[in-house]
């Protein structure tokens, strides 16, 4: 079952936390859910070259806080903060004007330890007509240098322009998908090539998080380990 379900959703409340943190009644919930989707889609389209790993949205009664984790904060901030100000103005048109908007940018120290950025690297290489085996091999080497304990990459489609689509995958180290305490990062992306669309999936194993360890507290953003077990 661990190989079929989404690795991040499978670990919500254990080693992963929600990317959107807010509460709403049954009437407002679908509106806010669509609003979150619009926010993420707009940021990814506007900052497609900013190497964004994740976007977290926290809502309060009169405030919306957006956290952007990126490997290239200079592109997001812009010259003298002009980029982030332009982004804030554009996002305010999507949100309720009565709510205050805050946008925080966090720099990712090691981009090769993020599955999203590894998958984007592979898709960029494939769209530049680099052989898929070479692109995957480079991505695996970069992930290993980032001190990940295991990496698995799968590429599907008309590989190297073959007539019949197929899937090939490479794994180095351990990637225990069925171990709930395993800190697994996952991402899937699409590469649009002249031969069609190629699917790219990346799994990164960053180590096991034990219930009594402090790393679980930081991973799930809770105050005590007991609260994670309840």
UniProtKB/Swiss-Prot annotation:
Q: Which domain of life is it from?
A: Eukaryota
User: Record keywords: Iron included?
Assistant: no
Q: Does the keyword DNA-binding apply?
A: no
Print the keywords alphabetically. Chloroplast, Plastid, Ribonucleoprotein, Ribosomal protein, RNA-binding, rRNA-binding
The UniProt entry's GO CC annotations, sorted and at most eight, read: chloroplast; cytosolic small ribosomal subunit
Q: Which GO terms describe its molecular function?
A: rRNA binding; structural constituent of ribosome
Q: Name one GO biological process term.
A: translation
Supply the Pfam families for this chain: KH_2, Ribosomal_S3_C
Q: What is its main location?
A: plastid
Domain KH type-2 as annotated: residue spans: 39-109
**Compartment list:** Plastid, Chloroplast
Family per record: Belongs to the universal ribosomal protein uS3 family.
Instruction: Cite the record's note on assembly.
Output: Part of the 30S ribosomal subunit.
Protein name per UniProt: Small ribosomal subunit protein uS3c
Tell me which species this is from. Pyropia yezoensis
Starting at the broadest rank, the lineage of the source organism is: Eukaryota, Rhodophyta, Bangiophyceae, Bangiales, Bangiaceae
């Amino acid at each position: 079952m661990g190989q079929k379900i989404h690795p991040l959703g499978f670990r919500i409340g254990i080693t992963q936390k929600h990317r959107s943190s807010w509460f709403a009644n049954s009437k407002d919930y679908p509106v806010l859910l669509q609003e979150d989707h619009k926010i993420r889609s707009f940021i990814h389209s506007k900052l497609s070259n900013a190497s964004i790993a994740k976007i977290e949205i926290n809502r309060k009664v009169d405030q919306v806080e957006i956290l952007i984790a990126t490997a290239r904060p200079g592109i997001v901030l812009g010259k003298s903060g002009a980029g982030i100000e332009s982004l804030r103005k554009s996002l305010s048109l999507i949100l309720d004007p009565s709510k205050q908007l805050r946008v925080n940018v966090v720099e990712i120290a090691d981009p090769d330890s993020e599955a999203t950025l590894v998958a984007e690297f592979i898709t960029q290489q494939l769209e530049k007509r680099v052989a898929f085996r070479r692109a995957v091999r480079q991505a695996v080497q970069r992930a290993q240098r980032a001190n990940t304990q295991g990496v698995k990459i799968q590429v599907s489609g008309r590989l190297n322009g073959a007539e019949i689509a197929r899937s090939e995958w490479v794994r180095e180290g351990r990637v225990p998908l069925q171990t709930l305490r395993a800190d697994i990062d996952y991402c899937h992306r699409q590469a649009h090539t002249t031969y069609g669309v190629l699917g790219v999936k990346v799994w990164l194993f960053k180590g096991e998080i034990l219930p009594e360890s402090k790393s679980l507290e930081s991973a799930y953003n809770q105050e005590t380990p007991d609260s994670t077990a309840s």
